Amino acid sequence: MNKRTLLFVSLIGIAFVGCQIFFGYNEFRSCKNLAEKQRKISEQTLAAVESVGLSVASWDTDVNGEEHKNNYAVRVGDKLFLLHNGEAAQSVYSSGESWSFVDHKCGFDNIHLALYRQQGSSFNPTNTGKVFLPTNHEGLPVLVVEFRNNKEPLVFLGEYAQGRISNKDSTIFGTALVFWRSGSDYIPLGLYDSREEKLVSLDLPITRAVIFGNDQDSAKSSDTANHYVLFNDYMQIIVSEESGSIEGINLPFASTNNKSIVNEIGFDRDLASEKSPEALFPGLSSKLPDGQQAKNSIGGYYPLLRRGLLSDSKKLLPLEYHALNVVSGRELATPVALRYRVLSYTPHSIQLESLDRSVQKVYKLPENPEEKPYVFETAITLTKETEDVWVTSGVPEVEIMSNASAPTIKYRVIKKNKGSLDKVKLPKVKEPLAVRRGVYPQWILNSNGYFGIILTPLSEIASGYGSLYISGSTAPTRLSAISPKNQLYPVSKYPGYETLLPLPKDAGTHRFLVYAGPLAEPTLKVLDKTITQEKGENPEYLDSISFRGVFAFITAPFAALLFIIMKFFKLVTGSWGISIILLTVFLKLLLYPLNAWSIRSMRRMQILSPYIQQIQQKYKNEPKRAQMEIMGLYKTNKVNPITGCLPLLIQLPFLIAMFDLLKSSFLLRGASFIPGWIDNLTAPDVLFSWQTSIWFIGNEFHLLPILLGIVMFLQQKVTSLHKKGPVTDQQKQQQVMGNMMAILFTAMFYNFPSGLNIYWLSSMILGVVQQWITNKILDSKHLKNEVVLNNKKHR
C-alpha cells in the first residue's frame, strides 16, 4: 500500500470516528436532556399525587439496616406495592414503619408484585371489590409508575387505549405499575410490560380496576349485566347496572296512553314498519321488579335519549354518555365508578351502589305523576371527598325541523332577585368541552327542539356548568337506520350534546329534580304550579319554550298572538289544521281595509302607467326632470307607489312568526290534518314516497308547495286582467318577476313544514279572491279611469 492510499484510508477512518463521536455525543446529550425533562415531570407529578396519598419510598428487609436506595416501592395509603424476583419477604420496612406481607402476583418474566399492609392498619384483605372500566375510545387517563434500572421510579400521567400505555412526554422502557384514579383514591389497574405492550391485571385481595375484555371476571360481568325498568303513565326509565346511570328514557305515545301528549310521527312509523331494532322498547335486556324479563314491543314509545344503534352492538352508546352519570377526567367523559349492584328495586324506585362503594344512586318516580308529569328525582351519594366531579344530562335524540336539527342549551339564573334565561353557545368539534365557572344555574336545559332534559339541583352544588360536543359516530342517532343505503340521515350530520353540572368535592348526598319530556305548555305549567306550591318559588320552566329565529325579538309577540288565536280555533274545531286556515281568514279580515286601499292604489298606478311612459319619453335626456314630473303626477292624482308593497310587508312578520311557532310549539308536532297526506303539521306533507333519493327533492313528493306556486302564478294572471292598453316593458318585467317569485317560493317552501304551507297557501288563495272582489267593486263604484294632467282631467 503506497503512502497516498494509506493517507486516504486514514483520513476516511478519522472522519468516520469523528462522525461517530459527534453524533454519539449529540445523542447522549439528547438522551440526557430527555432524562432530565422526564425526571422533572416525574417530580412535579409525584408532588401532586402525594397530596392524595400516593408516594414512592425506599424499603429494606432489615429493621436495623438502612433502607436500600435501589429498592423502591409505591405506597398508597396503608398499602405498599413492590416489585421483586423470587420469594417475597414476610415483612419489610419503609418510611420508618413495618409492613406485613399480604399476597403477591406473578406478572411476567419472573417479575412479581407483592402487596404489603401497614402494621396496625384497618386494611381488611377480605373487603375487596372491582371497579369495571369501559374500553374508552378516547383512552382512559391513568397514573404510571415506571421502574427503570434500579433508579428512583418515574411517575407520570398517561393514557390506556387498545392495550397500550402512552404518554406524549415519556416513552416507557421498563416495567410499570399502572393506577386508575377513583375519586381521591388510586386503584391499581395492572402491571405493564413495555416490550410486549401488554397490561397484566392484578389478582390481589384489594379493590382493583378492571378493563372490560381484559379480564375474565369483567367479561363475565359485562355479559351478565342487567338493566332495570322504572315506569309510570308518562315515562319508562331504563337503568344500567354497568354504569349505574340511565341508558334510556322512553315516552309513551298518546295513542297508547291517554295521559301522554307525545304523538307518533313519520320517523316512528317508518322504523316500526321496518321492524327495526331501533323501534324496540325497552330495547335492552331488562328486568322487572318481580324478576321477570321485560318484553320488547315494537313502537309505542319515543326514545328521548340516544341509545346508539341497537342493531349493532359495536354502535351502542358508550357508558360514559349515559344520563345522570358521575364523571371526571380531562374531557369529563370518564365515569368515577362503574359496575353497580342493586340494593332495592320497585316499579317506581331503584337504589344502586358501586362495587367499590364510592357512589350510591337512587332514582325515584313521583307518587303523584299527574302533578309532576315527565319528572323523576335522583339522589347521588359520594362516600369520599372527590374533586372535579360532574353529573351529566345524557344526549337527546335528534328532532328534524325544516330539514335540520335544532339542538339548544339554556340555563336559568337568578340575577338581582329576578330570573333570566341565558342561551349557551354550542361547543364545536375542535373544542368539544366548554366549561364556565362563576354562575349558579337554577336549572339547565338540554333540548333537541321539541323535547328537553332539565336538571334542577335540589341541594347545594358547586358553581358553573359544562357543555360537551359528542360526534355523531360516537352517539349515532336512530334516524341513521332509516334508508342507510341512501344516507338520508348520516351520523356525521347530527352530533350530540350533553350538559353537565359540578358536584361539591365533599362527601355527601346531592339531589336533583329531572324533567325529561316535551317542552309543552300544558305539562310545564302544571310542573311550575306544583313546584311553586312546594317550594314557594316559581322555577319558570315555561320559559324553556321560546320562539327561535334570527328575528325572534321582533316576531315573538306575533307568534304568541297567533298561538292564542289558534288555540281558540282548535278548541272550537278540534283540528289544528282547520285552526290554521281560520287563523288566515281572521288575519285577512283584520287587514282587509289596508289590503283594499293597497289594491286601489295599485289600480291607480296601472292607469297612470301610459302617462308615466310619455313623460319618460319626453324627458329621456333629462332624467331628473322626468323624475320630478312623475312625482308631481303621483301627487296630483294622490297615488303613493310604495303602498303596493305594504300588504306583503305587513304579512311578513306573521309569516316568520308562523314559521317560528311551528318550530317551537310542541302541540303541533305530530298533529294530523289529512291522514295519509298531511300527518304532521311541523313536517312537510308527503303525498307519496320512493326509495332512491333525488337531489333537492329527496325521496318524498310534497304537494302543498307545488299548489302554492300555482296559486302565486294565478295571482299574477288575475292582477294582469285589469291592465288595459299595450303591455309596457315595465309590465313585462313585473310579469317575469312574478313568475320567478312563484318558482322561488315553490323551491323555498318545498321542505318547509306543512302547517306553514297551509298558512301561506290559504293566505294566497284568500288574497286572489280578495283582489278579484275588490277589482269588481272598484270597477263599478270606487275608481274612475280619470287622470289629472296639468290640472285637467283625462280619460
From Swiss-Prot:
Membrane topology according to the record: Multi-pass membrane protein
GO biological process: protein insertion into membrane; protein transport
Gene Ontology molecular function: membrane insertase activity
Alphabetic keyword roster: Cell inner membrane, Cell membrane, Chaperone, Lipoprotein, Membrane, Palmitate, Protein transport, Signal, Transmembrane, Transmembrane helix, Transport
Transmembrane segments: 450-470, 549-569, 571-591, 642-662, 694-714, 741-761
Intracellular or extracellular location(s): Cell inner membrane
UniProt xrefs under CDD domains: 5TM_YidC_Alb3 (cd20070)
Classification via InterPro entries: Membr_insert_YidC, YidC/ALB3/OXA1/COX18, YidC/Oxa/ALB_C, YidC_ALB_C
CC per GO annotation: plasma membrane
Origin superkingdom: Bacteria
Lipid-modified residues, N-palmitoyl cysteine kind: C19
Signal peptide: 1-18
S-diacylglycerol cysteine lipid attachment residues: C19
Listed PANTHER family: CYTOCHROME C OXIDASE ASSEMBLY PROTEIN COX18, MITOCHONDRIAL (PTHR12428:SF65), OXA1 (PTHR12428)
Subunit structure: Interacts with the Sec translocase complex via SecD. Specifically interacts with transmembrane segments of nascent integral membrane proteins during membrane integration.
Purpose: Required for the insertion and/or proper folding and/or complex formation of integral membrane proteins into the membrane. Involved in integration of membrane proteins that insert both dependently and independently of the Sec translocase complex, as well as at least some lipoproteins. Aids folding of multispanning membrane proteins.
Family designation: Belongs to the OXA1/ALB3/YidC family. Type 1 subfamily.
Protein name per Swiss-Prot or TrEMBL: Membrane protein insertase YidC
